[in-house]
Amino acid sequence: MKKLSVIFLSVSMLSSIAFCDQDKVVATYKGGEVKESQIMQEFKPQLNLQSGETIKNFDDFPLQDQEKLIKIYVNNLLLKEEVAKSSITSSKEFQEKLENAKNQLAQQELLANYIKSNITDKMFDDEYNKYVDNLKGKEQIKVAHILVKSQKEANTVKTKLSKGGNFNKLAEEFSLDKATASNGGVIGYIILNQSGQLVPEFENKAFALKVNEVSTPVKTDFGWHIIKVLEKKPVPIPTKKEAKVTIDNILAAEILKKYISDLEAKADLKIMLPKANSKTGS
């Protein structure tokens, strides 16, 4: 029995040593060092949630992302030390903000738990089927645009394009949409009349274009657009797994709306403001 215990102890020690060897130090600073395991413990849950994929090892991240995570982690530690050295947390203003933050966090947790406990498999399946039926037979287009402030600027860009100007270069030079300008003005794929995408004026003009066709200037609340359609293809039908986030968000919005409405009804909420069309002189 003693011999067996020694074997188990040896194996345990070797496993610990192997684990320590694998847990590399990825950064040092005056306050200490940072190991891979610390980074993974801090960021893995939220990164998995954002990417939808299971990230197992620190090395799974691209090198530039590894550096970003290390800097974020160390900066948080350094700021935590600065906070500890200050008297900021004892001020009345901070305590009030802290209480507000706690209340908001508690409300968010309450709503998240309520939504989670009220989404059934049947609700998910029904909403998924409705979502899929709405996508069947629809077309999606890949669009790019150049956004400018005035119609005069839009006409100038359109003239340059008509004379053989390169759309990508003109987008980079003229577009006010900095999120897309450096990528040739590419917005991505859109579906006609799909909630939460682009404004109707833009969509209607875009879906009337042929592939590689460039629009005349289009006015929206954002300014003037020159639109180009890069590709057209049928909308792919997502699996339940692929559509899960979308369906969960749809159901969450519906459940939340009803929950708040029920709370208002129970509280017998009465708004005492005058009607909008009953103002004096209207």
UniProtKB/Swiss-Prot annotation:
The lineage, from the top, is: Bacteria, Pseudomonadati, Pseudomonadota, Alphaproteobacteria, Rickettsiales
* Enzymatic reactions: [protein]-peptidylproline (omega=180) = [protein]-peptidylproline (omega=0)
Please name the source species: Rickettsia typhi (strain ATCC VR-144 / Wilmington)
Q: What is its EC number?
A: 5.2.1.8
Q: Where in the cell is it found?
A: Cell outer membrane
- A GO molecular-function term, please? peptidyl-prolyl cis-trans isomerase activity
Record has Isomerase as a keyword: yes
Q: Name one Pfam family in it.
A: Rotamase_3
Q: Domain PpiC spans what residues?
A: 138-231
Q: What InterPro entries is this protein classified in?
A: PPIase_dom_sf, PPIase_PpiC, PrsA_foldase
Q: Which residues form the signal peptide?
A: 1-20
Cellular component per GO? cell outer membrane
Alphabetical UniProt keywords: Cell outer membrane, Isomerase, Membrane, Rotamase, Signal
Q: Tell me which family the UniProt entry assigns to this protein.
A: Belongs to the PpiC/parvulin rotamase family.
Q: What class of enzyme is it?
A: isomerase
* This protein's name: Parvulin-like PPIase
Lineage top rank: taxon: Bacteria
